[in-house]
Structures are given as C-alpha cells and as structure tokens.
Amino acid sequence: MKRPKLKKASKRMTCHKRYKIQKKVREHHRKLRKEAKKRGHKKPKKDPGVPNSAPFKEALLREAELRKQQLEELKQQQKLDRQKEQERKRKLEISPDDEQSNVETQEESDEPKIKKAKSGKQNPKKLHCQELKKVIEASDIVLEVLDARDPLGCRCPQVEEAVIQSGCKKLVLVLNKSDLVPKENLENWLTYLNKELPTVVFKASTNLKNRKKTFKIKKKVVPFQSKLCCGKEALWKLLGGFQQSCGKGVQVGVVGFPNVGKSSIINSLKQERICSVGVSMGLTRSMQIVPLDKQITIIDSPCFIISPCNSPAALALRSPASIEVLRPLEAASAILSQADSQQVVLKYTVPGYKDSLDFFTKLAQRRGLHQKGGSPNVESAAKLLWSEWTGASLGYYCHPPASWNHSPHFNENITAIMKRGFNLEELEKNNAHSIQVLKGPHLTNKILFRSSGLTNGILEEKDIPEESPKQTEDQQDGDDQEHVTGEKNAEISDVTPVEETREMSPGQSTASKPSDRSFILDKMSEEDDAYDFTTDYI
C-alpha cells in the first residue's frame, strides 16, 4: 500500500508471506543444484600448444601468427564490403523522383557532393571559433577569466587582439581561483596586471544547486543562497558603474581557456546554477545568454582553442584533449618538469625522485595503483597527477615577471582607452577587501610552478588543422572506389612473415583463444604433410 505524502510504497509484509517467498526461493535453488549435479562439471580442454621438442617450432609460430593476422584483415575487408552493399541497396530503394534529382546532381560534379556530405559533420573546434567570435561581437565588455595559479599562461594574445581591433570594447581581467595561491603572490600579480588592464580578484562559489526549491505543503519558493564567493560585489560595482556612464544596457562576454571557471563566475553572479559546470574540460560548447538584471546581460562562451605550437606543459594544462593528443606520461612529465621538485615531494609524500618515470613509479606505489602482476601502474599515476593539476583543488602558483613591459599587442594609448569609464580607485579598495577575506592555501598545498608565458590560441577557422578522427571515419565510410579493395587484397597476400621469435615454455599458449590456435594447427597439418613427426621423433 502506498503511504500518504510519500512516493514509495512500504516494504512491510506479513510473516506468512515472507516465509512463503523464502521457501520458494530455497526450493528453486535446490532444483538448480540438482540439475547441475546431473549434468556434471566438464573442464574445458587446454590446448598444450606446440611442444618444445618439435622441430621448426619458430617457423610454425610465425606462420600461425601470420595466418591469424590475415584472417583479421579478411574480416575487416568483409565488413567494409557489407557496409558498401548496404549503401548500394539504400540507394536503390529511393523513389523515382528522388533518383532523377540525384542523377542530375551527380552529373554536375562529384566533388561538391563530397563537400556537402562533409559539411554536415563539422569540426567542433571550428564551431567553437564561430561561437567565440559571436560572443566578442555581441559584447560591450569582455571579461577574460584567468586562473590565479598561472595568470600569464591563461592570457591569449590572439583573442585580446581581436577585442582591440573590434572597436570600442572594453577588456577586463578576472583572477579566478584566488584562494588557491598565497596572498602575497596574489597581490604581486594584481599589481602587475593592473598596469595594463583593470583586474578583479574573484573566487567563484562551488556550492551552487538548482535554481529553485519548491515544497508542496507550504507552496513557497525558496531562492538559493550562494556561499563562499569573494569578489562578487567588486565585479558588480565595476559593471554597474560602466553601465551608468554609458547610459544604456550593457552586454558582458565571458571568455577564457578551459577550466578557468567562466560558467562558475556567471552562476556566482546570478546566485543560481544556470550554466553547466563540472570537472571535465570544455563543457560549454555554445554561447549562452543570461540576464543579470534589466540593464546588464552576461554571455557565456566556449573555451579558447589552444594552438599546437605551444609548449608541452601549456598543452597539457590548457587543452581538453591533451591526454588524447599527448600520451599521459608525456603530458604529466611536462607538468612535472615545470614544478619545484622539493615541494612536489612534500605534497605527494613520496621520497626524492631522479626523473618523472621514477616519480610516477613511487606515486603509484604510494597510492596503491598496481597492475595485474603487482607492478606499479605508471600510466594511472600520470593520469592522477594530470587530473589534479587541471582540477580546482591543487594550489600551485607562479611568480610574476621581474620587469614589466607592455604586451606586444598593447601600448599606452590602448591601456588608457581600456581603463576609461571604470572607477579604478573603488576597484582597488574592493580588491584589497577581497584579498583580506580570502583564506590562503595550506603550507603543504603550495607548489611553485614555472610559467611558460602567454599561451597562443586559434581564433580563425582556417588555422585549425583539417584532420580529425571523425572526418577520417567519414572518409573511410564514404569511399566507394573499387581500387581500394584491390590494394587491400594485395596487401593481405603480400604480407611478410613476422621476424621476431618467441621463447615459450611447454605449458604456455601462443594465442589468446585456444579455439583459434587449434584451428591454426589443424590447418597447418592439412597444408604441409611432408614432415611426419610420429615416425622421425618418438
């Protein structure tokens, strides 16, 4: 029976019913055991493989490996043939009117047809660039969100140049995740960045929930109160003062590299979880317009696309697909090479290490990351370090450059134009108050990191490389040329035998599946009966 005011029914029942169910279950299990006992337990026969006493063992193994490889390639070829046959049948099932239109388009040219098919699945990086350009064009103020742990590495000169060239637009820097760096370091960075652009110290709230909570009994709406947010008032006053000086509505675009906290800043300003946030990089894939009040509208944007010409450490920290493009060991080693080794040892509580591989081995032993045989899983340890450094919990910091110089795309006139219309004195007071309120990281959670400088990004679609996994798959599926199949068949027939030999014990097997190996050995005996093992070797 369903209880009132509750969604789930009660699991209560009478003892008679419960004992009856238990009795039926016992009887069912007894019958299963009885049937299994009648059938008996037959152990699968193990294939002993090629004995060590057999002559030409290495040649047999090579031929078996070669035949297995040829069978796999043949299966792949048959799969491609089936797909092409299905495509041909689909084309035949099209109505006559559609056939006439298809014939006319095919007679014009084949190349435009291929281009149209490819345009249906566009590269997601190009879509990011398109959405980012839309945000910059629609914005009056562009907030470039920087990670306070590496502010210089989060600046993109290409995007800043686009904002400067687009006309009378303002560029403001927001130092997010300010609670993860020491206060002295944060003050030094604030002084360094304020010389060029207005900078706001910010710490986004991480305890946001859904927009509203409703209760059926009271029929009252309870708005959500955000917690642990610093710098919200300073940013509100900065945007509000600029809006009053303009005398019209203002649109604010939020841009930055992945995982710097763009969507978290919007949620903190709105005090609601409107934009999707998470640990994984690149969750925002299209622009999202959020009205803050009647006069100020904020626009969320997808992340910058990092250029492949950057340093390996920058690629590992700023690229969402760095683990896919780079190997985990390479990405984590690039990060580790830029960090202070003594502080890394204190943070991860491992003994001193010689190189990155030695560190990952000790870290895997420390965290209990082992492979099947008990050896340390170095790759899992590298992924663990990469996820911590790209997340929002590890506190590392960089020192600002010793000498200050204008960025290549800035000068004194541009700096004066960018600061015009903002109350910088009030902003300085609010930043000082925010730094005072913030709690710095723990001593063991501070790691000195050597920044690699400005990170180059890609804003133009033509600069994005055309090759991508999705496009290559589409090309393989859509390729209907007959000479490709001939080439593949020729490759299968002309495969050279494997030169490497394997040393095996009498009990070991050569292939992963026993059924495959038995088939291969039987096949060999049918093909070559010139040598008789039973008569010559007893």
Swiss-Prot record:
Residues 2-46 are annotated as: Basic. One of its GO terms (molecular function) is GTP binding. There is a cross-link at K91, K177, K248, K262, K270 (Glycyl lysine isopeptide (Lys-Gly) (interchain with G-Cter in SUMO2)). Residues 1-45, 115-125 have a biased composition (Basic residues). The modification N6-acetyllysine is found at K79. The modification Phosphoserine is found at S95, S101, S493, S505, S518. Residues 460-532 are annotated as: Acidic. GO terms for biological process: positive regulation of miRNA transcription; positive regulation of protein localization to chromosome, telomeric region; positive regulation of protein sumoylation; positive regulation of telomere maintenance; regulation of cell population proliferation; stem cell division; stem cell population maintenance. GTP binds at residues 176-179, 256-263, 300-303. Belongs to the TRAFAC class YlqF/YawG GTPase family. Interacts with MDM2; this interaction stabilizes MDM2. Interaction with MDM2 occurs in the nucleoplasm and is triggered by a nucleolar release mechanism, such as mitosis-induced nucleolar disassembly. May interact with p53/TP53 via its basic domain. This interaction is most probably indirect and mediated by MDM2-binding. This is Guanine nucleotide-binding protein-like 3. It comes from Rattus norvegicus (Rat). The gene is Gnl3.
